[in-house]
A protein has these predicted regions:
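Tandem CBS (Cystathionine beta-synthase) repeat/Bateman regulatory domains
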Residues: 1-141
Length: 141
């Protein structure tokens, strides 16, 4: 008769189930938005006062039409220095990014995390039925 020894019995670890965590659970709902006709001077002042890096641009119908960022503002500042015009008179619509990647509040947070890695973006506007309802950033995830 041969007896075999398999070592000390190990307790099986319970299976971990990742719950369906949505963007709505982590997104920011209180947003600072801008108007396409605002001056870049107003935007820069708001970004500095609120200590934010950018914001969504909403048209008169309340629909997302772009995003304005620190980088977009820098373009206006550099243009003013180059042409020796101290006024930041350009409009948001002249500098905003209009090709905006968005997500919806029901999306899985892990899917959005992968989008952050793949697209090299820092934030996504969250739209529900075509309306801006929030923003999800890398810091939120």
């Amino acid at each position: 008769m041969v007896k075999s020894y398999r070592g000390v019995a190990q307790a099986k670890s319970p299976k971990v189930v990742i719950q369906d965590v949505s963007v709505a659970d982590y997104m920011t709902r209180r947003l600072i938005t801008f108007d396409p006709d605002q001056t870049m001077e107003q935007v820069i002042k708001t970004l500095l006062d609120k200590k934010i890096a950018g914001g969504q641009v909403i048209d008169t119908r309340g629909e997302l039409c772009g995003i304005i960022s620190e980088g977009d503002c820098l373009k206006e500042v550099v243009k003013g220095k180059y042409t020796n015009t101290p006024s930041l008179s350009g409009k948001v619509s002249d500098y905003m990014s209009t090709n905006v990647q968005t997500v919806n509040p029901e999306m899985n947070i892990f899917e959005v995390a992968q989008m952050f890695l793949n697209m090299k973006l820092r934030r996504f506007p969250v739209l529900k039925d075509g309306k801006l309802v929030g923003q999800i950033s890398q810091k939120d995830v």
